[in-house]
């Protein structure tokens, strides 16, 4: 029996569907591409505030940029001549899903492979230039990446040019097995021939530079620069900690840590790299 049920002390409101629809219709939608979250300070940033260099205005974190964006920041306008575009990536091991991954990377980046190679001018100084793009299968080094960089050094020897490489990589490309690992030795041999010719080689380490690229040509430059807070190393942090059974410093494998221990010559802000490259190339004989 519900003869003595207490009355509710609140009223019930039935939503007015027509009113609800009109309210939601007037709420402005913010496009996803307008803002970016800084991985370092976690702040939401209006993308236009990042500028062309894509540097966080709050903490100065350097966002990862594409090879084309790097090219725009670095070389004299209209001076870049791309080379070795006809070299095609093969699938010698018939690795499952590799062809699809390659095609997707090409569509995302507009590149044929993980490295952009060519000749360019930087403030009037001619250089042989390679820029690795981490958006292309994490800039992993396969046979084509190794071949393009090797040919770049060979061209630089023939034309008496300095070589400048912006490195970024997750390491050797597992889909190509031992052939990807062989690129470490092949490129290093080309670096040696270039050095024997008395020519200048400059590397700029960007985030991330790891694995086989670090263990070969990334650390073989006559001068090694790095962008602030770039991750640079061979094996991963957790792998090392598990192996040595020790806790590593918080800044371990950061560019600043490597500079303190003599592996990097200087940390250079992204906005100052163009001037620094031109100065170093000119100081070491130039490229005219």
Swiss-Prot record:
Pathway: Lipid metabolism; malonyl-CoA biosynthesis; malonyl-CoA from acetyl-CoA: step 1/1. Its cofactor is Zn(2+). Its EC number is 2.1.3.15. Gene3D superfamilies: 2-enoyl-CoA Hydratase, Chain A, domain 1. It is found in: Cytoplasm. Binds 1 zinc ion per subunit. Zn(2+) binds at residues 38, 41, 56, 59. Belongs to the AccD/PCCB family. This is Acetyl-coenzyme A carboxylase carboxyl transferase subunit beta.
